[in-house]
Amino acid sequence: MKIVVTGTRGIPNIMGGVETHCEELFPRMVERGYDVTLIRRSNYVKDDLHEWKGVKLVTIPSPKKKSFEAIIHTFCAINEAKKLGADVLHIHAIGPALLVPYAKLLGMKVVFTHHGPDYDRDKWGFAAKTILKMGERMGCMFADDVIVISNVIKNLIARKYGRTKNVHLIYNGVSEPEICDYPEYFKELGIEKGKYILGMCRFVPEKNLHHLVEAYRQLIVKNKKLIEQGYKLVLAGDTDFEDEYSLGLKQMARENGVVLTGFIKGRKLHSLLTNCRCYCLPSSHEGLPIALLEAMSYGVKVVVSDIPANLEVGLPKDDYFHCGNVDELSEKLGKIIEAPLQHVDYDMSKYDWDQIADEVGGVYQGLKK
């Protein structure tokens, strides 16, 4: 069965939640006997790969302009999928889903994965938000099957579009943690094991990393001994499009002694997750955050905003703070630093990528009927 995937910037080693999702899922689909081709956006690709872990990679041009790169690339990708003779076109995210009707007009079977209402993201203006809402509508109304990554999204599309048939709740997953140390890297960053708060995500407004930096600033102003003791805030990530927000965030971080790692993967990231005091995700918008699940898989104490997507993870009440309340966040971080270093045994059973791949395979097989 030939599957063609679009709606992602690409794999491997490309920043983003959808990208991480695809990087984990589709090699597993190949292992299950599917012929998978994933179409990448040229401006994010830094390699000349044509295949990765069995997934065929086709790279086609796209304009690196956030307002319309996804839609133009998806149009080209659908035409490519038709040429390749796809049995199923799997479209990710609501922006690319705007073209689900076009794919249906070409006679294709379409699976649409809804990763979250992206029109809630702070970075989009009115026109972009309108197009994203239209994309959500087109995907939910015309795709043969819809995969949602949380109950929040499942309830959303039932309420807005009455879509309940062939809607499949399949969570994001997380891989087994790779517990490791990396003394040379820690020396380079100037940090110590167990003495840093970790923020790990893209530098975009809705992640609210500026709130985390401000909470850290308040913390060290109240207790200057924390600096003497070596406690720091580490932000792991970057942005696809350097803009006023990301530049301002980096400046704010540097002024407050925050460690900026840039976009990292592999041993560097694993060592930061292994040894952090806690992980913090203060965002105002999420689908089902893979970064949070990844931190949980390492048994890390977490502090997250109380938005619906984070609440669905089902953490203890004390792990949440009111979204946007910097004082409350700062207070919680202070208590975590004062308490003994914790290892938390979370139940990660429903976030197993192999189980997820089996469930996605069931969706594909249903299209044969």
Question: Residue ranges of each PLM-predicted region?
Answer:
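Short hydrophobic beta-strand element within catalytic cores of glycosyltransferases
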Residues: 297, 301-304
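Conserved acidic donor-binding segment of nucleotide-sugar-dependent glycosyltransferases
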Residues: 318-327, 334-339
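A short, active-site helix/loop in glycosyltransferases that binds the activated sugar's phosphate group
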Residues: 140-168, 174-176
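Short His-centered aromatic/hydrophobic patch
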Residues: 91-96
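Membrane-proximal helix-turn-helix segments that form the acceptor-binding/catalytic region
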Residues: 79-82, 105, 129-146
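Nucleotide-activated donor-binding/catalytic signature segment of Leloir-type glycosyltransferases, i.e.
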Residues: 246-264
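Aromatic "clamp/platform" in nucleotide-sugar-dependent glycosyltransferases that forms part
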Residues: 284
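Conserved donor-binding/catalytic core segment of Leloir-type glycosyltransferases
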Residues: 4-6, 190-217
